[in-house]
């Protein structure tokens, strides 16, 4: 047991798109930055920023080739560092399909959150980490090991994302529809526990929709120029001339990262889910909406602002978007949002199905898309059993939807009754990392 009431806990929610970190008890995270890392290989380990070289005493000879490579790469983390273009900088993501694939990068993201953003000493604060519902035991143990061995935290707790979203809205039982950056996951929560067998997920998240919109715009001959690739000169008052700047050493991954930032903003600003399933005929002469790109050109976007969001409900639309052919094999196996919700509920015990239908919670950055709540509710009312009273709940505040997992963690870690739940450093030293399975079921 850990008795650390006098210092506030730190809550970290590392998503596939954004990392959120801050103090328990506050109503929003202090640090919010992209959970990707810029890496420049072959930099001599002498000029180190947030370098992946750790202070190990092992000699150069005992290092493997890949370790030597890693020790020569320089890493850049955070919104500011990532917005600056560097030659040969690749953009790497440590998370694949919601699960951590590169712990070295995660370590650097945590370090940035603690040292540069929150400016705290991790040895003085208990840590609450949010984790995906399908996280493996091996992943949890690795996280515990890093937290206790490297950051030397006094106590740790790992809580599942859907449970925290449920707590954020003051419920113990609900069906959480988490539309994140990398995937969409539907998880039933009953009395504060996730029903693992009924969790349903799909790879269609916010980033997939952003890519659909990017490809669709490019197929119409619209060039999305990243901010570093042009200069604007004022010719006359209010009139600008745009000149391309040729930068040959920019990597493809960094160019795409910058384009996704711009297209992501277009998506958030003007896209909305259509009230009825999308088809080209009914939306061909829809009024357009304008959006000004950073280089000054104004886009007029018509049908695409409805077509792209409808991919969430009808994934087969992807096959009609030029440039998205590589997903052709994946798409037939992916189900639309209403079907995923029903599939998840049908995997649960009959006794709780009614309660789940009446408390469907929307969470995640993509859930803030206009009309998503209304369309999901409408489709579910049409397709669900008559006895079910469908109610889709979503906070009217987009910040609360986007940060619901973090907010739930902030509430949980500041509860007086929660303080005996922490997995303490002394318990870790006595029982080892595998004890996390007992402390945080």
UniProtKB/Swiss-Prot annotation:
GO terms for biological process: chromatin organization; long-day photoperiodism, flowering; pollen sperm cell differentiation. One of its GO terms (cellular component) is cytoplasm. SUPFAM superfamilies: Actin-like ATPase domain. Component of the SWR1 chromatin-remodeling complex and of the NuA4 histone acetyltransferase complex. Interacts with the SWI/SNF complex. Interacts with EAF1A and EAF1B. It comes from the Eukaryota. This is Actin-related protein 4. InterPro entries: Actin, ATPase_NBD. It is found in: Nucleus; Cytoplasm. Induction: Before cytokinesis. Coiled coil: none annotated. Residues 60-70 have a biased composition (Basic and acidic residues). Involved in several developmental processes including organization of plant organs, flowering time, anther development, flower senescence and fertility, probably by regulating the chromatin structure. It comes from Arabidopsis thaliana. Residues 48-73 are annotated as: Disordered. SMART domains: ACTIN. Keywords: Chromatin regulator, Cytoplasm, Developmental protein, Nucleus. GO terms for molecular function: structural constituent of cytoskeleton. It holds the Pfam family Actin. Mostly expressed in flowers, and, to a lower extent, in roots, seedlings, leaves and siliques (at protein level). The lineage of its organism: Eukaryota, Viridiplantae, Streptophyta, Embryophyta, Tracheophyta. The keyword Transcription does not apply. Its main location: nucleus. Belongs to the actin family. ARP4 subfamily.
């Amino acid at each position: 047991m850990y008795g650390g009431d006098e210092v506030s806990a730190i809550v970290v929610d590392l998503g596939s798109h954004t990392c959120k970190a801050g103090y328990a008890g506050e109503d929003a995270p202090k640090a919010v930055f992209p959970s990707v890392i810029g890496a420049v290989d072959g930099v001599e380990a002498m000029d180190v920023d947030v370098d992946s070289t750790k202070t190990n005493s092992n000699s150069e000879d005992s290092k493997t080739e890949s370790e030597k490579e890693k020790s020569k790469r320089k890493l850049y983390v955070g919104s500011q560092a990532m917005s600056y273009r560097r030659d040969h900088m690749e953009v790497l993501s440590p998370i694949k399909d919601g699960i951590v694939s590169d712990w070295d990068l995660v370590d650097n993201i945590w370090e940035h959150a603690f040292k540069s953003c929150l400016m705290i000493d991790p040895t003085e604060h208990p840590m609450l980490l949010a984790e995906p519902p399908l996280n493996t035991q091996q992943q949890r143990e690795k996280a515990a090991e890093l937290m206790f061995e490297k950051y030397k935290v006094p106590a740790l707790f790992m809580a599942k994302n859907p449970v925290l979203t449920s707590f954020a809205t003051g419920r113990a039982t609900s069906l959480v529809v988490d539309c994140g950056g990398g995937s969409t996951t539907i998880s039933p929560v009953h009395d504060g526990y996730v029903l693992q067998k009924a969790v349903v997920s799909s790879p269609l998240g916010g980033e997939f929709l952003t890519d659909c919109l990017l490809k669709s715009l490019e197929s119409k001959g619209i060039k999305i120029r990243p901010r570093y690739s042009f200069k604007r000169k004022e010719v006359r008052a209010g009139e600008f001339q745009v000149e391309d700047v040729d930068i040959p050493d920019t990597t493809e991954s960094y160019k795409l990262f910058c384009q996704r930032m711009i297209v992501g903003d277009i998506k958030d600003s003007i896209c909305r889910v259509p009230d009825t399933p999308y088809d080209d005929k009914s939306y061909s002469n829809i009024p357009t909406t304008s959006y000004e790109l950073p280089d000054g050109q104004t886009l007029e976007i018509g049908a695409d602002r409805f077509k792209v969001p409808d991919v969430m409900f009808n994934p087969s639309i992807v096959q009609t978007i030029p440039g998205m052919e590589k997903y052709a094999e994946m798409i037939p196996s992916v189900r639309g949002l209403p079907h995923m919700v029903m599939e998840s509920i049908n995997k649960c015990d009959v006794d709780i199905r009614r309660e789940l239908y009446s408390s469907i919670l929307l969470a995640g950055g993509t859930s803030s898309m206009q009309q998503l709540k209304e369309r999901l509710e409408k489709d579910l009312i049409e397709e669900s059993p008559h006895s079910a009273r469908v109610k889709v709940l979503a906070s009217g505040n987009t910040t609360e939807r986007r940060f619901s997992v973090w907010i739930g963690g902030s509430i949980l870690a500041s509860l007086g009754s929660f303080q005996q739940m922490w997995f303490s450093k002394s318990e870790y030293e006595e029982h080892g990392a595998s004890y996390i399975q007992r402390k945080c079921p």
